[in-house]
Amino acid sequence: QVPVNRRPRVAIHSSGNELVAIDSALKPGQIRNSNLYSLQARVKRWGAIPIPRPILRDDLTEIRSGLQETLELKPDAIVTTGGISAGDLDHIREVAREMGDDVQIRKVAMKPGKPLVDGLIGGVPFFGLPGNPAACLVSFEIFVRPALARMEGRTDGILPQRCGVLKAER
């Protein structure tokens, strides 16, 4: 007998009033939802199955209902981008705390990618990543990719740790 693990299903939401579909014409103040496609590609690259979800607008009720609908799909993980900083319209962190178990809001000492929200929502691992595209991808690689590897029973996706000593400063 050979032990096997099924491929994790990862629901992906972007959030923000400024986001539009990638094929939409841009109006002033709008940006394309490029994070959805970048994250889908990374999720596929690491052997999981992406579940693209609608954009979550900057509205508490819409975010709650959107995440609840996503939970009904029974994903193995949920990833959101944007809405996790301290802005007046950044509601993902608040809703994640309301809906979640042991949800942590962190300021990680790295750039790009300082804000991070993680924990469980409805028993499902939840990762709230920054909305900045570079920060989103860096955070995915550092935090989400190792979690997906573990869900699959793999060790090759887990980032190695290296210790070093700084011998000179510029």
Where in this protein do the model-derived segments appear?
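A generic local secondary-structure boundary/capping motif
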Residues: 1-4, 30, 67-68, 106, ...
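Short glycine/serine/threonine-rich phosphate/pyrophosphate-binding segments
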Residues: 21-22, 86-90, 136-137
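N-terminal small/polar loop signature for handling phosphorylated ligands or for N-terminal nucleophile
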Residues: 40-99
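Short, glycine/charged-enriched hinge/interface segments at domain edges or termini
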Residues: 1-57, 68-69
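Flexible glycine/proline-rich
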Residues: 95-170
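Short glycine-rich anion-binding loops that position phosphate/pyrophosphate groups of nucleotides
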Residues: 17-18, 83-86, 131
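Solvent-exposed alpha-helices and their adjacent loops that cap or buttress functional pockets
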Residues: 2-6, 44-45, 69-72, 109-110, ...
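A general structural motif
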Residues: 30-36, 57-63, 106-115
